[in-house]
Swiss-Prot record:
Keywords: Antibiotic, Antimicrobial, Disulfide bond, Glycoprotein, Immunity, Innate immunity, Repeat, Secreted, Signal. GO terms for biological process: antimicrobial humoral immune response mediated by antimicrobial peptide; biological process involved in interaction with host; defense response to bacterium; defense response to Gram-positive bacterium; detection of bacterium; immune response; innate immune response; killing of cells of another organism. PANTHER family: PEPTIDOGLYCAN RECOGNITION PROTEIN (PTHR11022), PEPTIDOGLYCAN RECOGNITION PROTEIN 3 (PTHR11022:SF12). Its main location: secreted. SUPFAM superfamilies: N-acetylmuramoyl-L-alanine amidase-like. Pattern receptor that binds to murein peptidoglycans (PGN) of Gram-positive bacteria. Has bactericidal activity towards Gram-positive bacteria. May kill Gram-positive bacteria by interfering with peptidoglycan biosynthesis. Also binds to Gram-negative bacteria, and has bacteriostatic activity towards Gram-negative bacteria. Plays a role in innate immunity. Residues 264-269 are annotated as: Interaction with murein. This is Peptidoglycan recognition protein 3. Detected in skin epidermis, eccrine sweat glands and ducts, ciliary body epithelial cells of the eye, in small intestine, colon, stomach and in mature epithelial cells of the tongue (at protein level). Highly expressed in skin and esophagus, expressed also in tonsils and thymus and to a much lesser extent in the stomach, descending colon, rectum and brain.
Amino acid sequence: MGTLPWLLAFFILGLQAWDTPTIVSRKEWGARPLACRALLTLPVAYIITDQLPGMQCQQQSVCSQMLRGLQSHSVYTIGWCDVAYNFLVGDDGRVYEGVGWNIQGLHTQGYNNISLGIAFFGNKIGSSPSPAALSAAEGLISYAIQKGHLSPRYIQPLLLKEETCLDPQHPVMPRKVCPNIIKRSAWEARETHCPKMNLPAKYVIIIHTAGTSCTVSTDCQTVVRNIQSFHMDTRNFCDIGYHFLVGQDGGVYEGVGWHIQGSHTYGFNDIALGIAFIGYFVEKPPNAAALEAAQDLIQCAVVEGYLTPNYLLMGHSDVVNILSPGQALYNIISTWPHFKH
C-alpha cells in the first residue's frame, strides 16, 4: 500500500501556529481512571500517526461515546491499561486526551517509550481526515514542540500501516529491532565465568522471580543484584539464573545475556532463553510496559540470530512443577506467538 497523502502532512506544514490547542480532557469525554504508569522521557523524538476506522462521529458527544467504547475494548478485551494513544484527533476538529503527555502509549511496540502516538478517528471509512482534524493535529504538534514534549527535529517514521489493519481489534505492532538493555555493569554484577549457550536457542521460557517487584530503575537494579547474590551464594549457581530480567519500569536487565547458559530450568539451560519478570504474578499480571519489553526482547532475539525463528515459547510451569511464572502471567503468555503448552 502507498503512503496515505495526509500522512506526509506534518513533514511539509510550517508549524507556525503556537496557539494552545483545544484539548477535550479525559474527564470531559468520560474516561475511566488512568491505570498506566510507565512514564515518557521528554522531549520524545518521534511521532506515530494512526487512523482508526469504524468510529465515525462529527460531534463531541458522539466522539466521546466512541472513545469510551474504545477504552473499554482496550482495557477489558485486549488487556491494556488504557487506550493506546497519547492523543486522538476527531473528525470534528477536536483533540481528545488519551494517556496524555507524560505516559507511554501502547500504539507501536518498539516506539512507545520514545514517541507520541496520535490517532485520527471519526471520518468515513476510505476517506482522509477532515481539514479541521489535520489543522487540530498541526496545532497539537506545534504546542508539543513549544512546551518541550516533542523535539523540534522530530521524526515521523513511515511504518506503512494498512488502514484495514488499524481496527483496534487487530492492531498492527511494528517493532524496532531491540529494546534498550540495561547492562550488567549498570547493576554492578559480579564477574563470573560460566558455560556457553548453544545458539541459536530453540525455546523461550517465561519465569517470575517470585520476590519483590520494582517500578523504578534504581530499585530494579538493586533487586537484580540481590538475586545474583542469592543465586550464587545460597543456591551455588555460577551466576544469576536468568538470561534477562524485566522490571515493571519497562526495563530489560541483562542477566547472563545471550551467550551464557542460564540456571533456570534443568534440561533446557543450554538451549532456552530464560526471561524472568521481576515480581510475583499469581493473581495480578505484570504491567503493560513490562509485557511489551519482554515481547520486544523476544523479537530482538530472533532478528539478531540468538533465537531460531521457529522457536517454542513456554511457561516455567510447563517444564517444571512450580508456580512460576504465576497464573496471571501464564494466562497472558499463552496468547503470545509460538506458545506451546
